[in-house]
Each structure stands twice: as structure tokens, then as C-alpha cells.
Amino acid sequence: MWYISFATFFFSALLDNLAAAIVIMAVLRKLVPDRTDRLKYACMVIIAANAGGSWSPIGDVTTILLWVGKNISAMHQISHVFIPALVNMLVPLTIAHFWLFKKGSTLRVLSEEEQGDEYIPEIPNRSRRMIFVIGVLSLALVPVFQMVTNLPPFLGVLLGLVILWFYTDLMYSKLHMHESQKLRISQLLPNIDLATIFFFLGILMAVGALETSGQLGIMSAFLDKHVHEPYLISFVIGALSSCVDNVALVAATMGMYPIVEQAADLSPYAQFFVSDGGFWTFLAYCAVTGGSILIIGSATGVTVMGLEKIDFMYYTKRFSILALIGYCCGAGVYMLLFA
């Protein structure tokens, strides 16, 4: 459980929490044959994936929005959110270890016969490792690409795709394989999830319409008058993300509170809303990890729920309280360190 959780935590930061959860679940299906135990692992993967995605600029759609919008920078987010995110994972993991995994879980290693159907043996191990390294680095180095070139981050991802495409085509040109066995990049393009892309496009267009019509300005003025506590606003937004899509919440928040330009005469309250301000940094933590409180609160949770057929009440009874405790503990650690 600890190895799986830490692997998910760090892979989420490199790949993004949804992709990491899908990869880890594929591994779990081979390692944990008993479904009762695997459901517990799967629920813990959701918490670890969202925690890991919160401290990376490419770890979740919401952190990508904040990073691309220049609300937070990559190094600032990593340095400020890593420890709270780690606490967010460790607290539920520790409780689950003593409460839900008292007898442990029996893991198994696949025999060569079982592994035979899972991959194409003609591809050399060296080439497989190279494909893995290129794929991971093409995502992990996107923030570095953006800082060095000052180009949009998506160009860094496309550059990694081009390199991977070139390498795989070069590799297959040297292998004597039937064309149907060659897993080329061009074969994957028709499988792009356009529905999800249009979903996020619709959210951003709707938020833009609300911002243009002035509704978001009215809401921010109301919160400034009656709440006037940026950390509390971020905390509540995170809690709401457990039942409302966090992308919509963060996009709306970015429309409500435009980035304030740095100046010497800024009030203490306005300083929360500058680039790398406390409000945006805490929001990056809250909006992602808050989605773990309910299994339907994040794309990761919904995906794992579908993969393993996890019942909503199963997660709510066993892991919602753990996720809430971890969420509050991580928020408390952030406040102690940076508030």
C-alpha cells in the first residue's frame, strides 16, 4: 500500500493525476488478485493521485489553468504545496494502514506465461525503457521548456510527442514485425477524447460569459465584503470541489479575482492576489485535494470508480472521512508554514 501510494503521488506530478491513476490501476489488477483488497487500494490511489497532482503545475487541469494563467509559477507551487500535499496523503494512508489493512494484502508476481499476452516480445527491452523515459520526460520537462523558451506549454508537449513519434517509427523500421503489431502514434490519434476537450472548452466559455457580463465581479465584491479572508475562500472552494467540478470553480475564481500587479503600496489584502500570492497557491492545493472527499469530486475518482465498479457509499463510508482529515491536516500545515 505504501509503495503504491507513493508511486501514485509522484507519478501524478509527472503525468497528471488522471493518467497516473489509470496506469496504477492497471498495475494493481495484476498485483492484487482479491477484489475486496483491490477496492481499498483503488480508493487510496484516488487520494494519493489528487494529492500528487496538487503540487505540480501539470498535475491537474486546475493547476494547469493557474500556471498558464500566470497566477502561480512552477517552482513557487512546488516549493509551497509539496509538503501540505504530502501530509494530505500520509495522514489518510497511515489511518488506512492500521484501520483497513490490519491483515495486509497478498500480492503476486506474474509468471512469464501470464505476461506473454500483455506485450509484444519482439520489442527489445532497451527500446521499451527508452519509450517510457521519453514519454515521462516529455511531460515532466514541460515547465522547464516554458521557462527557457517562454513559449506556450502545449508546444512542449507537442515537441515530446514529435520525439516519441520519430523514435517509435525509427524503431519499427528496424524490426521485422507485421504492420498490425506496430503500435504507431498515428494509430492513437483517432482515439483522442474530444468529448472531454469540448467539455472543458464549454466550461471556460461559460465562465468567460459570466465574467464579461459582470456576474463574477458582483460575486467577488460580495465575498470581499462579507468574508474578506482569502484563505477561507480557498478552503471553501476546495470543499465545494468535492461535489462541483473543480475546473469550473477555479476558472470562475480566476475570473472573479484578476491578478493584481505588484506594487509597493498594495494593501495586505491585495497582496494575496498578486502572481504567486497566497490565495492562488492555497487554491492550487485546496481545489485539487478537495476533490478526494467524495469519489465523484474529481475526474480521477470518477475514472477509478468506473474501472473498478466502486460503489459511491463504499467510498463514502470508508474513505471520505480519511480524505477530509487529510485535507484539513494539509491545509493546517500550509497555514503553519506560509500564512
Predicted regions and their residues:
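Transmembrane helix-loop junctions in multi-pass membrane proteins
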Residues: 141, 145-147, 208-218, 334-339
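Membrane-water interface at loop-to-transmembrane-helix junctions
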Residues: 119-133, 181-204, 221-225
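Hydrophobic alpha-helical transmembrane segments
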Residues: 2-6, 42-43, 78-82, 129-133, ...
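Generic alpha-helical transmembrane segments of integral inner-membrane proteins
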Residues: 6, 10, 86-95, 133-141, ...
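Flexible hinge motifs at transmembrane-helix junctions and intramembrane kinks/re-entrant loops
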Residues: 140-166
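Interfacial loop-to-helix junctions that mark the boundaries of transmembrane helices
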Residues: 74-84, 124, 146-156, 188-192, ...
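Membrane-interfacial helix-loop connectors
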Residues: 11-18, 22-48, 52, 61, ...
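Juxtamembrane and boundary regions of transmembrane helices in multi-pass small-molecule transporters
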Residues: 35-36, 55-56, 65, 75-123, ...
